[in-house]
Amino acid sequence: MKRLLAFSVAALCLPALMLAQPSDGSKQVEYQFTTVKANPITSVKNQFRSGTCWCFSSLGFLESEAIRLNNIKDTTLYPDFSEMFVVSHSYQDRAEKYVRLDGKLNFGAGSECNDVLYVAKHYGLVPQGVMPGLNYGTELPVHGELDALAAAYVKVITSNPNRVLSTAWKKGFQGIMDAYLGECPTEFTYNGVKYTPESYRDSYKINPDDYVSLTSYTHHPFYEKFALEISDNWRWEQDWNVPIDEFMAALDNALENGFTVAWGTDVSEKGFTRDGLGILYKEQVKKTSGSDQERWVGKSEEKNDEPQAPEEEVADQEYRQKGYD
């Protein structure tokens, strides 16, 4: 069976012009982009005030895969998978693991792409309209209360006040998920067809076992699998470790041949902006103090009326490893 790549980006396709927007009234830095390859993608969804970016982005990848696998040309027929169906199953599995490990596991909103593939494989998928996951009075996800309540619940369970776990604790946690996100359906009718989550997934020819996950680090041998040591990889799923040049070549090859990709990254770095830019600054630019404009272009002794783009870092294998370590 042909194995596909899962490391996530929807398409190598960007607008022709994007602007670095300083907040001090100075001129914008303009970046010109050229579309090299545009593969079919679904619309960008709003995770709003939830920590479930991993689910929104990875389901976007699976939606693009459904388009490709079924050769869907009509955009009105593009799938829209329910994020909160995946989130509910993920949280419930994480709660069980957290309790098994006596609380020695990260219990938060974060996760990664392999989690979505796991849920799709073991529980299936459902349409957004069947489980919108908004049972708490807002039109967009707001998970502060849900996350705090879920974390408090599992902490109480692991404190073991009864000296033995009750038979009710899993149902109690599921009740929290059901109250906020809605019950995960085991059967539903959509567009006149009756499905289970598994049969709905299969109707789009999605097989989670067809995908492989790649990473690139030097603290493990290349061409072997290992579980990346980050707190969000709470399922301890394993990735194939390859040299960074091969990692990027695999990405380029996938995109060029019509495949979309799931790319996991940390968007808390300063180089990410709200208007859609991601720039890996040179270290001295990161440390530049002063105005927002100075952080973008670096402070110069000579005034320049034209804003200058910040110097970018070249991320080689050593640089990547240093950032991880």
Per-segment meaning from a language model:
Residues 1-4:
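Positively charged n-region of N-terminal signal peptides that target proteins for export
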Residues 7-16:
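Bacterial N-terminal signal peptides
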Residues 22-303, 307-325:
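Catalytic-core signature of thiol
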